């Protein structure tokens, strides 16, 4: 697990408050279309946005996804332009899409690390100790008692014209069995977990939303110290 750096400056180019929207459960394609609309608005001088939502069940593949990592049962997959590999979205998983104009000089890896740090702090607020794993993006519960490292939150983004799209997903009380048909995030030697699985009680999306929103905004604006680790899962098209 990572050591900690000091506080950072805001990574946003703008100073206006981030517009936070809770969309409820929304189709993946509809949310993707909305992201692109908001990104164009941001590029034209509009506000930063943070979309929080759930998706109906869907598999999405990042640009680095390999053929053998896709569902073995032929389940449809939406191919996306984000970084990272294949993952699952569905009910019980809180998804966040920050549409943010990044400050110069662009530091995309630092942006990803801020998202990771925000989710680490959210997990800690529930009493779940998490951190980073060197060379692997996302947020992890360390292996214990014969169990492997377990991913509790995934991150995959794209940056185009200094503006971010896609984002993160944290498992609250989702069906972890849905990950069984794929190699989640291309990592075959690790597991997947959720807040509910780690705590032994139901932790629904509604209980997590406000904590995630606050932590992400704090991390983007430098109010949360950053740990030290590399962060793959980035696709940059400046």
UniProtKB/Swiss-Prot annotation:
Protein's cellular compartments: Cytoplasm
Single GO MF annotation: lipoyl(octanoyl) transferase activity
Pathway recorded for this protein: Protein modification; protein lipoylation via endogenous pathway; protein N(6)-(lipoyl)lysine from octanoyl-[acyl-carrier-protein]: step 1/2
Record keywords: Acyltransferase, Cytoplasm, Transferase
Residues of the site described as Lowers pKa of active site Cys: 151
Chain sites annotated for binding substrate: 82-89, 154-156, 167-169
Domain BPL/LPL catalytic: 44-224
SUPFAM superfamilies membership: Class II aaRS and biotin synthetases
Pfam families, sorted: LplA-B_cat (PF21948)
EC nos: 2.3.1.181
Reactions the enzyme catalyzes: octanoyl-[ACP] + L-lysyl-[protein] = N(6)-octanoyl-L-lysyl-[protein] + holo-[ACP] + H(+)
Class of enzymatic activity (EC top level): transferase
GO cellular component annotations of the record: cytoplasm
Catalytic-site annotation from UniProt: 185
Single GO biological process annotation from the record: protein modification process
Family to which this protein belongs: Belongs to the LipB family.
Protein purpose: Catalyzes the transfer of endogenously produced octanoic acid from octanoyl-acyl-carrier-protein onto the lipoyl domains of lipoate-dependent enzymes. Lipoyl-ACP can also act as a substrate although octanoyl-ACP is likely to be the physiological substrate.
PANTHER family the record matches: LIPOYLTRANSFERASE 2, MITOCHONDRIAL-RELATED (PTHR10993:SF7), OCTANOYLTRANSFERASE (PTHR10993)
Anything else known: In the reaction, the free carboxyl group of octanoic acid is attached via an amide linkage to the epsilon-amino group of a specific lysine residue of lipoyl domains of lipoate-dependent enzymes.
Protein's name according to its UniProt entry: Octanoyltransferase
Protein species of origin: Mycolicibacterium gilvum (strain PYR-GCK)
Lineage: Bacteria, Bacillati, Actinomycetota, Actinomycetes, Mycobacteriales
Gene label: lipB
């Amino acid at each position: 697990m990572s050591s900690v750096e000091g506080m950072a400056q805001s990574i946003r180019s703008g100073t206006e408050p981030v517009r936070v929207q809770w969309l409820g459960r929304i189709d993946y394609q509809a949310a993707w279309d909305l992201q692109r609309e908001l990104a164009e608005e941001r590029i034209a001088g509009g506000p930063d946005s943070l979309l929080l939502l759930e998706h109906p069940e869907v598999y999405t593949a990042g640009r680095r996804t390999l053929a053998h990592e896709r569902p073995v049962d032929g389940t449809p997959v939406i191919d996306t332009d984000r970084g990272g590999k294949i993952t699952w979205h569905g009910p019980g998983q809180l998804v966040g899409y920050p549409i943010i104009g990044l400050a110069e000089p662009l530091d995309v890896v630092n942006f990803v690390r801020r998202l990771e740090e925000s989710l680490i702090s959210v997990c800690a607020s529930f009493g779940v100790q998490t951190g980073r794993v060197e060379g692997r993006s996302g947020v992890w519960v360390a292996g214990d008692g014969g169990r492997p490292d377990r991913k509790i939150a995934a991150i995959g983004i794209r940056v185009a014209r200094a503006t971010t799209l896609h984002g993160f997903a944290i498992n609250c009380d989702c069906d972890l069995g849905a990950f069984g048909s794929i190699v989640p995030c291309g990592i075959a030697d690790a597991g997947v977990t959720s807040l509910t699985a780690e705590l032994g009680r139901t932790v629904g999306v509604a209980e997590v939303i406000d904590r995630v929103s606050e932590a992400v905004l704090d991390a983007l604006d430098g109010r949360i110290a950053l740990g030290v680790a590399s962060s793959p899962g980035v696709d940059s098209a400046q």
